[in-house]
A protein has these predicted regions:
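Short acidic beta-strand-loop surface patches of small beta-rich interaction domains
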Residues: 40-44, 50-55
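A glycine-rich, hydrophobic/aromatic-adjacent loop/helix-cap motif
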Residues: 462-513
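A generic structural motif
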Residues: 104, 353-363, 406-412, 483-498, ...
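Phosphate/pyrophosphate-binding active-site segments
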Residues: 432-470
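A cross-kingdom feature strongest in bacterial/archaeal respiratory oxidoreductases
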Residues: 30, 35-36, 345, 369, ...
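Short, glycine-/polar-rich solvent-exposed loops and beta-turns at beta-strand/coil boundaries
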Residues: 35-42, 64-65, 195, 675, ...
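N-terminal export/assembly segments and adjacent metallocofactor-ligating motifs
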Residues: 1-17, 21-24, 36, 51-54, ...
Length: 731
């Protein structure tokens, strides 16, 4: 502990603290611009300078460690003058006409008609107006003139990447984006280019972010103090009127987020003192306000879907249920609230319907694990799981543990395999055999495609260290590990553990292949249907690809209250941020209203459904002359209520390519396949057509696809490829 005096106040500071940190803790205000909590101090803006007794020059408090006996002054006339001078220097390369204008308040009424200008000349042209740290500092220092010639950089605005724009004409070179990208996210996409007055922030060789490994997490946007980096969606919606703390449900982690609202519209979603991923940062607002969303009840009348009142729609649905009693199938999404899931189970029980299951078919049942209990000095093994793409917030927490090693077992090459200490690339379907070799007590034959030397080196790494094995249970079958290895399941969707504990009446395949079912009730799910049904009732936000008889529009997770169970078995709270648009209603409200009409009680269901148990290994299918290529299928974690995000948002389409069949270069060369060509993929239980995307991430003689419930893609298997009659170039 150190004792020092700041502005005449005796203060005790902890060892390693900086003067700025001590002042912030004690409530002593020091202006900053380049400083950001949890990032390495930069000392670039010089606004946080302080005077230290005995020192000839002021020092930047953000980089100044405390020392015993220090006497510091933070607010002298000399410091005020120097800070104001530094701010004026910064403003000499930043459009400042509005910042120093005496009539700035008078022109506020004209802001809306000029703010969408292509070039930002002043605050009224900037999307960050009234939310800019520079504006606050100019007001604090009372800056009314800039004694330097204005230097405008004349840089083009970068709009060629998805999700956010970059206008480096208003960048102040604070370095926050560079540091957060490297230090917190570990992506190292951004850095400073050139020197002196030519210094700029950018990517290596000025490549687009899509080509540099950018995670599009938005961390750089969140720390930017000006409008240099700004989210594209909602950019001109206006100032945020309220921020509601809630939970992101677009994956199983359940990150805490802030839903920022303006005029009953979510304009953005931002982290709540944590890190989130591209789905939570840029996927929520455009998804829930998408123009294709249906917000009014509809029924089929004379072969056409027409809008009706809730009373008519509910009565129509109830009449269908009564008509098909005993022949009803219910398929619901894991992404319903736990309250809506309970209501669904109770509704099925009252209907005496045992044909009920969840859209995410969980093939293995493992116990949850609190990731806070994971210790350092360990080895983390990840099998068939891309943590950077699918679980980046969790991966950042794991990576922060002290002295850990990463081992990736995956036949696919990706960003995550490239950052691992060891990447074991087996033949597709041989991942379990690699695990057996790693933990074998005696020598075994090796047919995995991974060299004995790599196995040996990895085994040495595991020796004497605590080992954790992470896997998505739906990407691997029949997994067994020694007792000393802790297996941690990474289910892709929230509430997976809720479904596992509650059980289901049947499997997804049994439900869809049951010819006795005449009425299908789909709650947030739209699978590929292999046959016709007499009645299909859809309860969702978006219409399915097939015809239906009744549509009941539901509220999204931003428009209702509730709870969810995350990947660790913890309850996550959902808060209502906005009112549902149109006539949309929460799922549990819809089910409750139909139960009233049917005179059902709403007491908890006593029906006991079968627990989901581990399934045995799939029968291995060898390549044949008829099916010469192996299709690798991995679960698509970028979906909401069965809807693939790339189908409704262009940014995700450019980022994921999950509506393409990925082709290994050797297969493309052999079959003369070009990017964008329509290919027919046929196997024992698959027959689809998709455009081609050639990628070296796919191993030889293989193709790869993300799982698609709506297309029936869910199992890795041997396939054959045929070029469709018409081809089109990849967008």
């Amino acid at each position: 502990m150190s004792k020092l005096k700041i502005d005449g106040k005796e203060i005790t500071a902890r060892r390693g603290e900086t003067v700025l940190e001590v002042c912030q803790r004690e409530g002593i205000y020091i202006p900053t611009l380049c400083y950001q909590k949890n990032l390495t101090p930069y000392g670039g803006c010089r606004l946080c300078i302080v005077e230290v007794k005995g020192w000839s020059m002021p020092a930047a408090s953000c980089t100044l460690p405390v020392e015993d006996g220090m006497v510091i002054k933070t607010n002298t006339p000399k410091l005020k003058k120097l800070r104001k001078f530094s701010l004026q220097l910064i403003l000499s390369e930043h459009p400042h006409s509005c910042l120093i204008c005496e009539k700035e308040e008078e022109c506020a009424q004209y802001q809306e008609c000029i703010q969408k200008s292509a070039i930002t000349f002043g605050c009224k042209f900037c999307s960050q107006n009234n939310n800019c740290e520079l504006q606050k500092l100019v007001s604090y220092f009372g800056v009314r003139e800039i004694p330097f010639i204005f230097n405008y950089r004349h840089l083009g605005i970068e709009r060629f990447d998805p999700f956010f724009d970059r206008d480096y004409n208003i960048c102040i070179l604070c370095g926050r984006c560079v540091r957060v990208c490297g230090e917190i996210r570990g992506a190292h996409v951004l850095d400073f280019h050139h020197r002196g007055p030519d210094t700029l922030v950018g990517t290596s060789f000025d490549l687009p972010h899509l080509e540099t490994g950018c995670q599009f997490c938005g961390a750089c946007v969140d720390v930017c103090p000006t409008g240099a980096l700004h989210q594209r969606y909602g950019k001109w919606e206006g100032e945020v009127q309220k921020s509601v703390t809630s939970t992101c449900i677009l994956c199983s982690i359940g990150c805490s987020i802030k839903l920022n609202v303006c005029n009953n519209k979510v304009v953005s979603s931002t982290p709540n003192n944590n890190q989130i991923c591209v789905r939570g940062r840029f996927g929520i607002a455009p998804l829930i306000h998408h123009p294709k969303r249906i917000t009014a009840p509809m029924i089929k009348r004379n072969g056409r879907m027409v809008q009706v009142s809730w009373e008519e729609a509910l009565n129509c649905a109830v009449s269908k249920f009564n008509e098909h009693r005993g022949k009803i199938g219910i398929l619901f999404s894991n992404q319903l609230t736990t309250e809506a899931i309970d209501s669904t189970y109770n509704f099925a029980n009252n209907l005496k319907c045992n044909n009920i299951t969840a859209s995410l078919e969980m093939k293995n049942n493992f116990k949850p694990y609190d990731c806070k209990k994971i210790k350092g000095d360990s080895v983390f093994i990840f099998i068939n799981t891309n943590m950077i793409e699918n679980y980046s917030p969790l991966f950042l927490k794991l990576k922060s543990k002290r002295n850990v090693n990463l081992v990736v077992i995956d036949s696919l090459k990706n960003r995550f395999s490239e950052v691992a200490d060891f990447w074991l690339r087996p033949k597709p379907g041989k991942e379990i055999d690699v695990l057996k070799l790693l933990f074998a007590r005696k020598k075994m034959s090796n047919t995995t495609g991974v060299s004995y030397n790599t196995i040996k080196l990895t085994t040495r790494l595991l020796s004497g260290k605590k080992t954790y094995l992470f896997c998505n249970p739906n990407n691997i079958d029949n997994i067994h590990v020694p007792k000393r290895v802790r297996l941690i399941p990474l289910y892709s969707q929230i509430n997976a553990l809720k479904i596992l504990n509650a059980g289901v009446g049947c499997s997804l395949a049994d439900l869809l292949n049951n010819n006795k079912i005449d009425c299908l009730y789909l709650i947030g799910s739209a699978p590929k249907l292999s046959r016709d049904y007499k009645t299909i009732i859809v309860q969702d936000n978006f219409p399915p690809l097939f015809e239906f008889d009744v549509f009941l529009p539901t509220a999204t997770f931003t428009e209702t209250k509730g709870t969810y169970i995350n990947i660790e078995g913890k309850k996550k709270i959902l808060q209502k941020a906005i009112d549902p648009p149109g006539k949309s209603k929460p799922d549990d409200w819809i089910i409750a209203e139909m139960s009233k009409i049917l005179k059902f009680g709403m007491n908890p269901s006593k029906q006991k459904y079968r627990k989901i148990v581990r399934r045995g290994a799939l029968k291995k299918r060898s390549l044949t002359r008829k099916y010469p290529h192996f299709l690798i299928v991995r679960e698509n974690c970028y979906s909401y209520r069965g809807l693939i995000l790339s189908l409704v948002m262009k940014g995700f389409k450019r980022l994921k390519y999950d509506n393409y069949i990925w082709i290994a270069p050797d297969v493309a060369k052999k079959l003369n396949i070009k990017n964008g060509m329509e290919l027919k993929i046929q196997g024992q239980n698959i027959d689809i057509t998709m455009p081609a995307y050639i990628s070296d991430t796919v191993p030889e003689n293989c193709v790869f696809a993300y799982s698609h419930l709506s297309m029936g893609i869910n199992t890795s298997q041997p396939v054959r490829l045929e070029r469709a009659e018409e081809g089109r170039k990849k967008e």
